[in-house]
From Swiss-Prot:
Biological classification of the source: Eukaryota, Fungi, Dikarya, Ascomycota, Pezizomycotina
Gene Ontology molecular function: oxidoreductase activity
Pathway named in the protein's UniProt entry: Secondary metabolite biosynthesis; terpenoid biosynthesis
Residues that bind NADP(+): 76, 186-187, 212, 241-251, 317-325
Organism: Aspergillus calidoustus
Name of the protein: Aldo-keto reductase ausK
Binding residues for substrate: H156
Complex and partners: Homodimer.
Residue ranges the record marks as coiled coil: none
Domain of life, per lineage: Eukaryota
GO biological process, alphabetically ordered: terpenoid biosynthetic process
Record Gene3D superfamilies: NADP-dependent oxidoreductase domain (3.20.20.100)
Length: 396
């Protein structure tokens, strides 16, 4: 074997087509390698076009192709999205491209996903956190996705109707069977996730390795209890609504949409609030400081700076928006820029943090009760990728 052949065999891989292909470990408890931005498939389909805009199958396939061509491998969907079209079209795309092994697919169970065909009230056990709902949902997701395994399965929404042991035992059984590799949970109070992971650890079951929740510069409630909980249990955080339901838009972009006859399509309302407009303007200021126009790239960069193991979900329907958002991976926001963005909102950690303070591992500073006793120095936890001690992008 020649030196060139040895280098080709054991040398490093070539640089990726974009930073989307510079993969990251999902979490301390899940070693799978994923793209730093996850493609959200909520809009892949045309069944919900009245609320989310239309996307025919050709456009969906083109978007998936563009994401993969840029190095992306991490796709987020759910059993109910677009009345089951989302999973179905993704399955067709992977089958046609013969790329299932290259993709990391996350899907979800919990909400009623069959009423669109069976009728309201006639699909009662197709929803819920219980074992029967889980069994049928995974069976159907595997069929629609045309695969024999799901990389990450989320509980979509906690509904308070199923015990922690029933849920975790049933999920662990799927992992043992090889139908699911990693477990995630969405839209659930921190105390429930803590109880579930504690049960799993004590019983030798599979714990949740990733949490999915709503987070952006204006909606920071996740930082209060969920972010510390995720750190404690070694969980990643995948983020939806990272772009303010599509309402973080510059004046230029809004004018362009108006000229093209497009409004704001958003689940949480179709008009910018005064605060969303103010945040859009602030994002634009930071974007200009970095020599770009994309306010959405700055919104994503903000989340990527906040903590390690954070993976924003990027949705939308246009390939140009995908490329704009990939710019976020090359941005490094300063501490001052992050504080400037956060000053637009009115988030407050509240009790008990306003009394006991926050973890010195995050701030490097003693809490009031500790400072009262003696001067102290603290080891700080790891920063987000790209953020060193001298360029602190983490919240302080």
């Amino acid at each position: 074997m020649t030196g060139t052949q040895i280098l080709e065999l054991f040398g490093p891989a070539p640089e990726p087509p974009s930073e989307l292909g510079r993969y990251r470990i999902l979490s301390p408890t899940a070693g799978i390698r994923v793209s730093p931005l996850q493609l959200g498939a909520l809009s892949i389909g045309d069944a919900w076009s009245a609320d989310l805009g239309s996307m025919d199958k050709d456009s969906a396939m083109a978007l998936l192709d563009a994401y993969a061509a840029s190095g992306g491998n991490f796709i987020d969907t759910a059993n109910a999205y677009q009345n089951e079209q989302s999973e179905t079209w993704i399955g067709e795309w992977m089958a046609n491209r013969n790329n299932r092994d290259q993709m990391v697919i996350a899907t979800k169970f919990g909400p009623d996903y069959r009423a669109h065909e069976l009728g309201k009230g006639l699909a009662v056990n197709y929803s819920g956190n219980h074992k029967r709902s889980l069994h049928m949902s995974v069976r159907d997701s595997l069929r629609k996705l045309q695969t024999s395994w799901i990389d990450i399965l989320y509980l979509h929404t906690w509904d308070y109707t199923t015990s922690v042991p029933e849920l975790m035992d049933a999920l662990h059984h799927l992992v043992q069977r090889g139908e699911v590799l990693y477990l995630g949970i969405c839209n659930t109070p921190a105390w429930v996730v803590s109880a579930a992971n504690t049960y799993a650890q004590q019983q030798g079951k599979t714990q949740f390795s990733v949490y999915q929740g709503r987070w952006n510069p204006l909606r920071r409630e996740l930082e209060r209890d969920i972010l510390p909980m995720a750190r404690h249990f070694g969980m990643a955080i995948t983020v939806y609504d990272a772009l303010g339901s599509g309402k973080f838009q510059s004046r230029k972009m809004l004018a362009r949409r108006k000229d093209q006859g497009e409004g704001l399509r958003a689940i949480y309302g179709r008009q910018q609030t005064a605060q969303e407009e103010a945040m859009s303007n602030a994002l634009g200021v930071v974007a200009a400081q970095h020599g770009i126009e994309s306010v959405t790239a700055v919104a994503l960069a903000y989340l990527l700076a906040k903590a390690p193991y954070v993976f924003p979900i990027i949705g939308g329907r246009k390939i140009q928006h995908l490329h704009d958002n990939i710019q976020a991976l090359s941005l490094r926001l300063t501490h001052e820029e992050i504080k400037y963005l956060e000053s637009v909102g009115d988030f407050d950690l509240g009790f008990p943090y306003d009394m006991v303070g926050v973890d010195p591992a995050d701030t490097g500073m003693a809490t009031p009760i500790v400072a009262q006793a003696a001067p102290m120095a603290f080891v700080q936890r790891s920063k987000a990728i790209g953020y060193s001690e001298s360029n602190k992008g983490l919240s302080e």
